[in-house]
């Protein structure tokens, strides 16, 4: 996942690896708090929606510290939408259907 995040954020070298690894873990926990199933959000997932959400979260947080607040706001808006969609989608949550 670290390599995917670095590629998406156009980060080369290893200077930010520790910080990005922390952000990846934080993204997974944030999705879990929103109700996304922990089995779905493992950081070795191949699920495109989870990967995109984690990358977007990392972009939003990384831009706050090292980039543009405008870009950070755009990433945050996108991440919040992705998180909301995932937290309401069958197959991504632990919620069961009520009859």
Regions found by a protein language model. Give the residues of each.
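Short loop/turn elements at secondary-structure junctions
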Residues: 49-51, 55-99
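Conserved short "hinge" loops at termini or chain/domain junctions
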Residues: 1-50, 87-99
